[in-house]
Amino acid sequence: SGSCTTKTCWTTLPKFREIGYILKEKYNAAVQVEVVRASRLRQPTFLKIKQIRSYQKPMETDLVYIDKSPNYCEEDASTGSVGTQGRLCNRTSLSADGCDMMCCGRGYNTHQYTKVWQCNCKF
């Protein structure tokens, strides 16, 4: 009875879009932390959640940050960011040059220009 059964197992990654959704959720729930340098008894340096009277450490699965990201929509001379105010945008684009994205949801003004010139046409 020379019967043989072969079983092959493998693991696969989730779809790229699923990973993107998970990362976006983690980004939206990111926790600001601060570095605590312990000096007593040679304890190691660690991170704790940055809140008043909080001594809680972040979970290993938390996405953490130390400094808040600058708001690139607003002008900030200290970082050299000119912001987006007054910039031209593409009203129909869904990309980074689109008005909805570039103006950070604050709305935008549209202008229509008419130019009249002499074309020197001969009939």
Curated annotation (Swiss-Prot):
InterPro entries: Wnt (IPR005817), Wnt7 (IPR013300), Wnt_C (IPR043158). GO terms for cellular component: extracellular space. GO terms for molecular function: cytokine activity; frizzled binding. Glycans are attached at N90. Signal peptide: none annotated. The keyword Metal-binding does not apply. It is found in: Secreted, Extracellular space, Extracellular matrix; Secreted. Disulfide bonds join C89-C104. GO terms for biological process: animal organ development; canonical Wnt signaling pathway; cell fate commitment; neuron differentiation; positive regulation of JNK cascade. Palmitoleoylation is required for efficient binding to frizzled receptors. Depalmitoleoylation leads to Wnt signaling pathway inhibition. Residues 33-61 are annotated as: Disordered linker. It comes from the Eukaryota. Ligand for members of the frizzled family of seven transmembrane receptors that functions in the canonical Wnt/beta-catenin signaling pathway. Required for normal fusion of the chorion and the allantois during placenta development. Required for central nervous system (CNS) angiogenesis and blood-brain barrier regulation. Belongs to the Wnt family. This is Protein Wnt-7b. The gene is WNT-7B.
